[in-house]
Amino acid sequence: FRSGAFGDGGTVGELLKNALSKAGFTVSMYDYATMERGEIFTAGIEEMKEKFDLSIVAANVATGSNHTTRRVEWIDLMAANEPWYTKEIPTMFISFCNPYHMIDVPFISTFINCYSSSSYCVDAVVEKIIGKSSFNGKSPVDPWCQEVWGARFM
């Protein structure tokens, strides 16, 4: 989890972790600020597959009147926190507060738009992920970004 330039969502990562933990999951959060730099490059895919059943990439990068284009920004060190393992470890992307992140992660086949970072929305998306309620409704925006890079077919 990484929030955007507004500092918009420093709590969403913790809210998501707590909701998943409450649902019975063991949650490890990737902390790019304190991790060992070599850790990213030394862990092989087999080690990661043993350690993780699922990867959830969550972004809370809200748009604003003077920031209408807000993109996912990976850490500077060779984009090391970009999910390069999506074909080996089931991976989902949850976008809070910005329905247009599909253009940044077309290689992740499960994409969920959660239009707010409120605790209510975090709890609701976890209920849907674990099957307590279904995904209903129709997106008010074009999450496929006009078929950029064939995202619909990834």
Language model region names:
Residues 1-154:
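C-terminal non-catalytic regions of proteins with extracellular/luminal or membrane-system context
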